[in-house]
Amino acid sequence: MSAKADMKAGQTTRKSPRSRPSAATKTLSHNLNGQRLGRKGRDTRDRILAATNELLAGPADVELSLSAVARQASLGMTSLYNYFNDLTELLLAVLEPVMATAEEEYVGLLRTRWDDASLGEHSLALVTAYHGFWVKNSRLLHLRNRMADAQNERMMLHRINAALPVMRLMVEQMDGDLSKPQSPVFSMATALMTGLERIVTVTTDTTLQNALHAPNPLGRTHLLRAEARLLELGIRDYRMLAASGD
């Protein structure tokens, strides 16, 4: 996460210019050549997505590429390119059903105002749920973030757009004004979300943990509790500021 998230709050996603229609716009009715998808075409597309998920669930040292997906799906590259322009587009299609579960998995926990007396419990519940979401989808989400860190614009936008609902709900929990995305409370939400994402990134990165010789479940628990405490303090502090009119 970065200052871009602050700037994106309350704005619509900018469309990326493409030479061909994206898979997202042609998902159910046409392939990328404009041909209407029949049952066979839909089955082929589903095979590609299933093959991608199989590779993501496999050994972490196996590189994920379009050619690897084509082999896994027993398809030629020409057939695969009928459905996806590139690896980014394919991964965005895989991410779509995953992110559709975000509301039930963790976002919904923020929609009801948290009582002051139980801020700590609610904060820990959110951090734990978000961590659980990452555990379920770790390799895919790590891959998205690595691509975003490498300045892949579509993955950067996906990462920001995935965080925005949580950030805006954090602003509401802090009694902030959603119409003022440049306000300090939005910056606090950005900082809290950045910390939350970083904590779950570190605690679900087995390569990093092995490199640090620290695959310690208790250590992960301490980190999650520390992040929950920061979230609690941030919300409590800004509620007090809002109540005092500052």
Cite the ranges covered by each PLM segment:
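Amphipathic alpha-helical packing segments from all-alpha helical-bundle domains
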Residues: 103-108, 132-136, 142-145, 152-178, ...
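C-terminal peripheral helix-coil segments that are non-catalytic and often amphipathic
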Residues: 1-31, 168-176, 190, 194-246
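Helix-turn-helix
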Residues: 47, 51, 55-89, 93
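Alpha-helical DNA-contacting segments of helix-turn-helix folds
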Residues: 56, 91-98, 144, 148, ...
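Short hydrophobic clusters on alpha-helical segments that form packing/core surfaces
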Residues: 48-56, 98, 102, 130
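N-terminal positioning helix adjacent to the helix-turn-helix/winged-helix DNA-binding module
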Residues: 37, 44-51, 188
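Hydrophobic alpha-helical connector segments
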Residues: 89, 93, 107-136, 185-193, ...
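Short, hydrophobic secondary-structure boundary micro-motifs
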Residues: 65, 141-145, 156-157, 212, ...
